[in-house]
């Protein structure tokens, strides 16, 4: 785990408190893990022909069940997605304390290496879903922290890859409400079953509990009663048709309530479909990687001679979450996304040296400070607005800030200990190289797509000299050129020029040990240079070097840290800088999902305007889209944090798999949201 200077204790609860919240089932039955292993073997045998197996687990306990699934799956070629629902969020530090104090891993030495990999992934005590990907996508964990009913009901049903089986840890059997049973049923395959371990009547496996699950169409089995020679067929069952209909009604209610947020129908076999991606930066590279982990190939078309020549071309970029005082959907999304991106960097750089593309990065933390009275009020609101997990961020006084930065700032701030800086173009290149190792992914450089056309058999891409395709699915992930095509030119997104200054590392300045974020940002040195930026010019007329913006970048640092002697070490005389364009949305969410058919939306609006009936129409009618066309962009100035998770979610959508975001956040990411937000409120376009 990352070491943070002067960090407060990340362990908020002592061992007795933790063991009470996360009781270990194995402590009450010495043969529990052996019985669990038999059950897991039966499950894998019953679904050996599936390329992806989705399983649900209620309760994290001390994590041994999760590690046991990982161990049991390690020799299999199929992919496993394990969705774990735990009401009490826990971080890596407290999880390690549980393991150390209980010595549970000493009894299961095979689990120790897996446990260390889980800790290295730094699960955080945040509400919502955290996706952890291991073994090149073969084993994926979705950690859903928070109220179980809320987490279950926030998810959409995945008809192609529903939950096949549920394991419920005994200490949470009684905590599940009848509504939770039905939400589990909504997310499940028709033949899905429930397993638990009936240690005693007090564990909750009573006749009443069993009857409640059966009333939702489940059969319930006790792992204690599952013999090693039990036939595989007993794992599956077919529930009553009436109960299946009730499940379908729940799914239809969801679909109707979120019809304005279309999730286009996926081809029945995603691995047989052809996918084209236009763009050569972080978004397209990570989409290719997420698809490749699913065995899905793609063709990437980049107009430049190398990848990462657009907004992804900077030498260094800060990686840290965007937080709000309310911890709203934007804030929660960025926490999930930031942690996901951080894990991506770790995974790509921990591969064997001969199988790895280097990514320059240092997780040195990010220190946010105010630069005037208004920004101080805003920062104070964020700090005081929530009991932020200290692995996400914590307040520091001026003395602590100086110690973290290794240069004098003399002002308090908010420190993001898991943050740092990453080289964006190396990050994009490493993702593409990994994708090409895993699946049939190709990259066509110097290929400028001038137009796209929809045909009956897919999308055709036009260059100056040739027609490419058709492709069943086309993703526009082309950064500043996102709106260049007729089908995307109405997207409500704006280009902003950003000039990043490169200044030599010298004297006191070279001692900077963390990323500073105030009015602008300043990175620690990399290859003898610091990055100082960035300007923010809407709809720029040119991308040439601008001396005025260079001086403005310097002035921002003087405003942020006035009268500090190290400011004199910032030498701008070399006029060394890089200019890029980032695409920004008004609400700061990226755009991810089906490309909206804006002319059709406007045409329908003419027929359904400003009445109660029209609001109902837009709420319950699938919003118009360009079939087979998708958008991935609008990453703004925080693409390093948001881009990889947005790409992962789009890859899941393209392949018909469970998406690691809740319904409300998916609506916030939808490229049609600016229009539909008004229409759902009965406002004029």
Swiss-Prot record:
One of its GO terms (biological process) is tRNA wobble uridine modification. Residues 278-685 are annotated as: FAD-dependent cmnm(5)s(2)U34 oxidoreductase. Its main location: cytoplasm. Residues 1-272 are annotated as: tRNA (mnm(5)s(2)U34)-methyltransferase. Transmembrane segments: none annotated. It catalyses: 5-aminomethyl-2-thiouridine(34) in tRNA + S-adenosyl-L-methionine = 5-methylaminomethyl-2-thiouridine(34) in tRNA + S-adenosyl-L-homocysteine + H(+). One of its GO terms (molecular function) is flavin adenine dinucleotide binding. Its cofactor is FAD. Keywords: Cytoplasm, FAD, Flavoprotein, Methyltransferase, Multifunctional enzyme, Oxidoreductase, S-adenosyl-L-methionine, Transferase, tRNA processing. InterPro entries: FAD-dep_OxRdtase, FAD/NAD-bd_sf, SAM-dependent_MTases_sf, tRNA_MAMT_biosynth_bifunc_MnmC, tRNA_S-uridine_synth_MnmC_C. In the N-terminal section; belongs to the methyltransferase superfamily. tRNA (mnm(5)s(2)U34)-methyltransferase family. In the C-terminal section; belongs to the DAO family. Catalyzes the last two steps in the biosynthesis of 5-methylaminomethyl-2-thiouridine (mnm(5)s(2)U) at the wobble position (U34) in tRNA. Catalyzes the FAD-dependent demodification of cmnm(5)s(2)U34 to nm(5)s(2)U34, followed by the transfer of a methyl group from S-adenosyl-L-methionine to nm(5)s(2)U34, to form mnm(5)s(2)U34. This is tRNA 5-methylaminomethyl-2-thiouridine biosynthesis bifunctional protein MnmC. It comes from Shewanella baltica (strain OS185). The gene is mnmC.
């Amino acid at each position: 785990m990352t070491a943070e200077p002067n960090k407060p204790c990340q362990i908020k609860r002592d061992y007795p408190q933790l063991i009470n919240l996360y009781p270990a089932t194995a402590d009450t039955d010495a043969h529990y893990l052996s019985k669990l292993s038999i059950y897991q073997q039966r499950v894998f045998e019953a679904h050996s022909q599936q390329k992806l197996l989705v399983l649900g687990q209620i309760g994290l306990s001390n994590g041994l069940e999760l590690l046991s699934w990982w161990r049991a799956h390690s020799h299999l070629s199929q992919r496993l997605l394990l969705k774990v629902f735990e009401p009490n969020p826990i971080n890596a530090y407290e999880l390690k304390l549980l393991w150390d104090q209980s010595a549970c891993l000493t009894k299961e030495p095979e689990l120790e290496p897996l446990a260390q990999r889980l800790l290295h992934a730094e699960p955080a005590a945040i509400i919502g879903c955290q996706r952890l990907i291991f073994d090149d996508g073969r084993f994926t964990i979705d950690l859903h922290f928070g109220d179980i009913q809320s987490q279950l009901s926030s998810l959409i049903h995945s008809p192609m890859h529903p939950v096949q089986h549920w394991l419920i840890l005994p200490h949470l059997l009684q905590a599940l409400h009848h509504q939770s049973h039905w939400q589990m049923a909504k997310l499940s395959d028709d033949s899905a079953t429930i397993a638990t371990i009936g240690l005693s009547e007090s564990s909750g496996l009573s006749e009443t509990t069993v009857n409640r699950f059966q009333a939702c169409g489940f059969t319930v089995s006790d792992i204690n009663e599952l013999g090693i020679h039990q036939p595989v067929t007993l794992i599956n069952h077919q529930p009553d048709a009436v109960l299946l209909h009730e499940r379908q009604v729940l799914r239809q209610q969801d679909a109707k309530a979120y019809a304005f947020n279309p999730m286009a129908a996926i081809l029945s076999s995603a691995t047989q479909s052809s996918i084209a991606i236009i763009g050569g930066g972080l978004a397209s590279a990570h989409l290719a990687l997420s698809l490749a982990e699913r065995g899905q190939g793609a063709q990437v078309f980049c107009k430049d001679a190398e990848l990462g020549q657009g907004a992804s071309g900077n030498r260094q970029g800060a990686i840290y979450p965007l937080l709000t005082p309310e911890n709203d959907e934007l804030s929660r999304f960025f926490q999930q996304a930031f942690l996901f991106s951080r894990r991506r960097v770790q995974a790509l750089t921990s591969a064997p040296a001969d199988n790895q593309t280097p990514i320059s990065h240092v997780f040195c933390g990010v220190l946010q400070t105010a630069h005037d009275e208004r920004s101080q009020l805003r920062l104070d609101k964020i700090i005081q607005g929530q009991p932020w997990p200290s692995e996400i961020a914590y307040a520091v006084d001026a003395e602590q800030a100086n110690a973290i930065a290794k240069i004098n700032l003399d002002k308090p701030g908010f420190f993001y200990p898991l943050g740092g800086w990453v080289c964006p173009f190396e990050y994009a290149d490493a993702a593409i190289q990994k994708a090409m190792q895993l699946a049939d992914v190709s990259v066509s450089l110097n290929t400028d797509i001038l137009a796209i056309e929809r045909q009956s058999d897919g999308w055709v891409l036009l260059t100056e000299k040739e027609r490419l395709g058709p492709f069943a699915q086309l993703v526009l992930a082309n950064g500043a050129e996102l709106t260049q095509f007729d089908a995307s030119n109405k997207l409500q997104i704006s280009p902003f020029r950003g000039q990043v200054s490169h200044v030599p590392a010298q004297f006191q300045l070279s001692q900077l040990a963390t990323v500073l974020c105030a009015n602008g940002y300043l990175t620690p040195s990399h290859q003898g240079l610091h990055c100082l930026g960035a300007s923010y010019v809407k709809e720029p007329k040119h991308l040439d070097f601008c001396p005025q913006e260079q001086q403005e970048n310097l002035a921002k640092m003087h405003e942020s840290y006035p009268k500090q002697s190290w400011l004199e070490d910032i030498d701008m005389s070399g006029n060394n800088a890089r200019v890029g364009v980032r695409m920004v949305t008004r609400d700061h969410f990226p755009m991810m999902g089906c490309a909206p058919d804006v002319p059709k939306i406007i045409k329908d609006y003419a027929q359904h305007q400003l009445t109660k009936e029209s609001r109902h129409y837009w709420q319950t009618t699938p919003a118009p889209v360009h079939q087979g066309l998708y958008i991935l962009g609008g990453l703004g100035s925080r693409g390093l944090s948001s881009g990889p998770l947005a790409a992962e979610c789009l890859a899941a959508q393209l392949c018909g798999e469970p998406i690691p975001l809740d319904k409300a956040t998916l609506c916030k990411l939808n490229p049609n949201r600016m229009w539909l937000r008004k229409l759902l409120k009965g406002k004029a376009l």
